[in-house]
Amino acid sequence: MSAPVRIAIDAMGGDHGPEVVLPGVELARVRHPDTSFLLFGDEAAIRPILARYPALSTASRIIHTDVVVGMDDKPSQALRRGRYKSSMWRCIDAVKAGEADAAVSAGNTGALMAMAKVNLRTMPGIGRPAIAAIWPTLRGESIVLDVGASIGATSQSLIEMAIMGSAMASTVFDIERPTVGLLNVGVEEVKGVEEVKEAGRILREEGVAGVNYFGFVEGNDIGSGTVDVVVTEGFSGNIALKTAEGTAKQIASYLRAALSRTWRAKLGYLLARDAFAALREKLDPRRSNGGVFLGLNGVVIKSHGGTDAEGFAAAVDLGYDMVRHRLLERIEKSIVTRLPAAGRGSEPVEAEGSS
């Protein structure tokens, strides 16, 4: 029998704090009864909500913290004010100390990444971590990274992301040789910024052991599922992610308006209710909520700050799956066997985003 999964929760993170986080944790607990939780935050705010869920209370332990990292705090501010004593820091520190197998937070992205880097450090051979998101596509699902950890990327960091994304796809999707594409403004080899073109040249001509390089892909290829892993720098990746989420909400809004316009439309909806329910579920961004911080010596999951309980539960589910699939071990093995010797070049700029 497998050992229980221990997940550390930043109960104060996100736009709504424990009012959303704790119901989300309860939903995840029901799906994964072999899980225990460490809840970091203001005990006076946590305990009354936790009392609504007796089974979760039994499976949890509250660790009181006095400091909450604000959603608008810059990473440098968050580190100065919240290092060692905030719910976010203590949540990550539980992973470092071996008290938890994964940390989940809906807090400020830039602050969470900064604290995770300082506390957990990056794996040997990795210059900078990346945030990987599981993306619904016409073919099923794919992985897109980076979706917001850094702005800009060197050719070396793009190659590192290709290695980490490939390892994650093999783990999560059970694919022996997942295809990897570099996001670009065109598929032609002469197009794009120099860093992307150089990374493409290395992957295409020199190769990286175990990376099944497809070539350049464009924005429309993400939703089509042309490749299993899409690699890009964090600025473009975050815009693509937010655009896709906004488009899904826009389509859902259009459908609701169209199906309630006339009695014929309402009748058509009733006749095709099951099909529309399946479509609504497919378009629901909460199902894919949660980004994995790849390249760190520990599992850290970032939930959207404005999500609801179901969305936060999906982020906890993701952390559970990463632990059960032993993602860190697989990435470490991939780095040792695949990473080419190459200069890192200039470092990208750390993202300051908070969503």
Swiss-Prot record:
The keyword Transcription does not apply. GO terms for biological process: fatty acid biosynthetic process; phospholipid biosynthetic process. It is found in: Cytoplasm. It is an enzyme of class 2 (transferase). The keyword Cytoplasm applies. HAMAP family: PlsX. This is Phosphate acyltransferase. It comes from Azorhizobium caulinodans (strain ATCC 43989 / DSM 5975 / JCM 20966 / LMG 6465 / NBRC 14845 / NCIMB 13405 / ORS 571).
